[in-house]
């Protein structure tokens, strides 16, 4: 152990004594809980920095300075110790490492590989924390959070750069990820797709105007194709039970009997890309293939009535039953109801319930005939007739995908709530904040990491990413995980798993947050 390491150890012991005095000294007897908690947090961060610095110093101490052999058989002599900075959650720390060199061959730093350091200075933990914040918050807000909680200054440029680098392995991660165990899957395999516009920065114009003209915008939108695949258990419903749920009417006795708890998607995977419909659906088909098999009894493809998307869904998933998202179909009924009765008419809801029941009962052909006849009746205003004709035409074109009575009887989903929620939460809530403009590459990187987070793959992906990076940088396997981290985790887990652990320490368990509002909070069990 060098004198530097010994000095750091002495400083750590002094700081620990200060910590004890901070919570038990005379001043602590007059302090508030808030003062002690805040002070402890800052002092523990400082102590963590010293402990991590000691770790680096001791690893450098034990690192041999004897000449090393390269993979090619060349010998490199010890040249000097060289410093690199390490930006950790505790702040900026120096790492001194022995550097080995031979003229004409270059140099190597074995300690970098042993510590599994990346190419830049940011620690993996700091990267993962900032990126996890970044996939849900604007980048400058992420920087504010890091500054407020950890006292760190991480620029938006650094956050964006780290996300771009760490998103590079997402595609290869999902390519190697095994399909779920069939025993954990349900019998209905469901695919969904929809598009959502993302505001992009324009290509640099030769002479940007000082003031925009009427109707001009500073950016343009490009469609992000959002896809999802999951399995779900069959849930038989009646048209009436769906109407009762959708319009929050008092359910009939038969409807109550046929209203079990809602089935939930199993192993849902979502994805979004600006590479186009074909690229998105090709990838979706690749995801679907290993999940299909004898355990799957039904295959369902859900999307809205956008004809180009429907054609592609039929092309890429020919063995799936294409279903028009019922919510989209019902929106056309709402437009007719508003045109005929007005938004404030007391009978509008009753009219909607009546025609919704007809649609769900697979009587859409009758609805089409009624609307077409009304569209020719001159007693209705021109705008009313136009809306009737528009809806009749929409239903006529989508009639092959609107056999809802059969779908409900088989227990199939009839609404693309998963993908609608993904478009809103996954894309819009992050990419369409006020004044936000993206480069295509920047938003692709964000959406990749956001998919990893939303799919519940965050920790597993970053382990994969670190292994891939290590092979690229050092051409060797990632170091085996030492028991240190596992020991810390197990010690913490063993404390948490004891039923009396919290109560014996006078602690109440922290309540889990509620599920995010989304598909499962829809009034319609679809």
Predicted feature locations:
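Catalytic center-proximal scaffold of phosphoryl-transfer enzymes
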Residues: 1-57, 97-526
């Amino acid at each position: 152990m060098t004198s530097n390491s010994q000095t750091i150890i002495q400083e750590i012991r002094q700081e620990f004594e200060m910590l004890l005095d901070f919570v038990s000294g005379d001043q602590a007897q007059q302090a508030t809980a808030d003062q002690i908690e805040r002070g402890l947090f800052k002092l523990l961060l400082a102590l963590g920095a010293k402990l991590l610095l000691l770790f680096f110093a001791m690893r450098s101490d034990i690192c041999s300075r004897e000449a090393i052999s390269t993979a090619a058989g060349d010998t490199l002599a010890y040249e000097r110790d060289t410093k690199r900075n390490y930006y950790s959650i505790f702040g900026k720390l120096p790492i001194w490492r022995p550097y080995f060199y031979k003229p004409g061959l270059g140099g190597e730093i074995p300690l970098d590989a042993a510590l599994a350091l990346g190419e830049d200075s940011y620690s993996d933990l700091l990267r993962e924390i900032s990126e996890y914040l970044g996939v849900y918050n604007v980048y400058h807000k992420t920087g504010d959070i890091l500054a407020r909680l950890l006292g760190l200054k991480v620029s938006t440029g650094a956050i964006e750069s780290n996300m771009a680098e760490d998103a590079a392995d997402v595609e290869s991660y999902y390519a190697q990820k095994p399909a779920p165990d069939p025993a954990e899957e349900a019998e209905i395999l469901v695919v969904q797709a929809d598009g959502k516009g993302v505001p992009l920065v324009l290509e640099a114009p030769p002479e940007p105007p000082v003031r925009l003209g009427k109707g001009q915008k500073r950016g343009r939108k490009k469609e992000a194709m959002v896809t999802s695949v999951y399995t779900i258990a069959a849930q038989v419903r009646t048209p009436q039970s769906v109407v009762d749920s959708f319009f929050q009417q008092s359910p009939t006795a038969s409807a109550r009997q046929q209203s079990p708890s809602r089935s939930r998607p199993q192993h849902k995977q979502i994805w979004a890309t600006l590479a186009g419909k074909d690229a998105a659906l090709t990838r979706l088909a690749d995801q679907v293939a290993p999940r299909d098999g004898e355990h799957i009894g039904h295959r369902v493809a859900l999307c809205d009535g956008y004809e180009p998307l429907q054609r592609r869904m039929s092309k890429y998933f020919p063995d799936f039953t294409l279903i028009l998202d019922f919510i989209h179909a019902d929106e056309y009924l709402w437009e007719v109801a508003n045109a005929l009765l007005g938004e404030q008419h007391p009978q509008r809801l009753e009219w909607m319930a009546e025609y919704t029941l007809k649609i769900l009962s697979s009587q859409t052909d009758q609805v089409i005939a009624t609307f077409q006849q009304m569209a020719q009746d001159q007693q209705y205003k021109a705008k009313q007739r136009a809306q009737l004709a528009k809806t009749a035409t929409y239903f006529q074109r989508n009639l092959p995908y609107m056999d809802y009575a059969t779908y409900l009887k088989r227990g199939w989903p009839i609404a693309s709530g998963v993908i609608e929620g993904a478009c809103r939460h996954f894309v819009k809530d992050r990419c369409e904040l006020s004044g936000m403009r993206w480069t295509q590459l920047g938003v692709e990187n964000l959406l990749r990491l956001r998919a990893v987070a939303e799919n519940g793959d965050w920790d597993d992906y970053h382990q994969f990413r670190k292994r891939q990076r290590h092979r690229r940088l050092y051409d060797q396997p990632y170091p085996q995980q030492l028991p240190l981290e596992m020991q810390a985790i197990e010690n913490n887990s063993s404390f948490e798993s004891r039923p009396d652990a919290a109560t014996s320490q006078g602690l109440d368990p922290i309540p889990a947050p509620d599920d995010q509002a989304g598909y499962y909070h829809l009034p319609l069990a679809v």
